[in-house]
Amino acid sequence: MALKLLGFNQDATCFSVISSNKGVTIYNCDPFGKCFELEKSTSNDEELDFLVEMLFSTSLIAVVDKTIGASKRKKLKIVNTKRKATICELTFPHEIMDVIMNRKIICVVLKSDQIFVYDISCMKLLRTIDVRGEKLKSTSKFRNSEAVGDIGVRVSLSTDNNSILCYSSYSKSDKENAPLNDIVVFDALKCIQINVLPAVHQSNIVCIACSPDGMLMATASEKGTIIRVFKTIDTENDEPILVNEFRRGSRPSRISEMKFNHDNTLLACVGESDTIHIFALPVTTTEADANEDDTLQQSSHSLSSSINGLQYISKGLANRFGKIIVSKIPTQSQQRHVAYIKIPENAKYRIGFPKDTTNTIHICGEDGNYLVYSIPRNEVGPCTLVKSNTFD
């Protein structure tokens, strides 16, 4: 029986999976068990394919049935899992490629590189973003194609109510090749663009992760060897700054998912390799500790330790660390992981950070394993398995 993972919800309390003989199943993480099943609508033996986006642990989910038929792939259903009833249905002009949402906003991404932004409370359309833009539409490179290869627009939405939307966009500086390597930061509630990060990678961006509060954003390109973390907005000069550069490895590997933990101190990534990498981030806060000056006198040692990923930066450095790290990155090697998890190379895995449990990461795989690991805090090393369950 084939399994296909759909992923965790926003706070890693549930995850969803497709099984060939059942359809979509949502599992609760603690206590572990099934909490919802969406049975397949056909008795045929075709391979099932769905998009499912959960809204935390609520009874609301967004579903796109992409199994068979072009018309189904254009249709979004909002389903109440308790009543097992469709409460809203929307049809779009092109195939739906992704759906993301939080408690305020739902965003639908089409194969035509359009993003539809809705108020989730009433499903009112707030904005349609045409990522390709009028200039690119007029060029011969895009006239007769719906998307560029298999690289489409990538999106990520902050899970809090600020609703910061980050999405990839075609390069404004390289109009000849037009790679998807610019990033636009968009306030989805106010429907205004608040920042643009040009050419964050040389090639197409294949994965974006927005931090829960929308203050940070991680990006990875097709090569997947380097992960970059940016501030979405610099509070002093309104320009984005590079917070960290992480080296995942030397061999190319397409990264399928990245996640920040809920206090923005860790970033995890998973892809085609046999390792889930966890990187340490500097603490960012506007509150300075009383002993900030004393801490800053020892900043050389603290910064060196943090750069090597061996400990987290103290809160006393938080206000000044953003400026320090930018000057340090160009002259130092890219940072490696502080923790890792080995996984079977032939099984796809998804990752999630629980909000209420610190120093813990959840993973689930298409081999039918749901695993909880403890992350080492004071030294580089493997994560420790603390809980395991199986699902089908």
UniProtKB/Swiss-Prot annotation:
One Pfam family per UniProt: PROPPIN
Q: Which UniProt keywords apply?
A: Autophagy, Cytoplasm, Membrane, Protein transport, Repeat, Transport, Vacuole, WD repeat
Q: Where in the cell is it found?
A: Cytoplasm; Membrane; Vacuole membrane
Q: Signal peptide position in this chain?
A: none
Q: Does the keyword Membrane apply?
A: yes
Q: Does the keyword Lyase apply?
A: no
The WD repeat boundaries are 200-240, 250-289
Among InterPro entries, the record links this protein to: PROPPIN (IPR048720), WD40/YVTN_repeat-like_dom_sf (IPR015943), WD40_repeat_dom_sf (IPR036322), WD40_rpt (IPR001680)
UniProt superkingdom:
Eukaryota
User: GO CC terms on record?
Assistant: vacuolar membrane
Q: Where is the motif L/FRRG motif annotated in this sequence?
A: 246-250
Q: Name one GO biological process term.
A: autophagy
| Membrane-topology annotation of the record | Peripheral membrane protein
Spell out the PANTHER family in the cross-references.
WD-REPEAT PROTEIN INTERACTING WITH PHOSPHOINOSIDES WIPI -RELATED (PTHR11227)
* Comment text on domains: Contains a beta-propeller domain involved in specific binding to phosphatidylinositol 3,5-bisphosphate (PIP2). The L/FRRG motif is essential for the cytoplasm to vacuole transport (Cvt) pathway and for the recruitment of ATG8 and ATG16 to the PAS in nutrient-rich medium and in both its recruitment to and dissociation from the PAS under starvation conditions.
- Annotated family: Belongs to the WD repeat PROPPIN family.
* Its job: Required for cytoplasm to vacuole transport (Cvt) vesicles formation and mitophagy. Involved in binding of phosphatidylethanolamine to ATG8 and in recruitment of ATG8 and ATG5 to the pre-autophagosomal structure. Protects ATG8 from ARG4-mediated cleavage.
* Protein name in UniProt: Autophagy-related protein 21
Gene field? ATG21
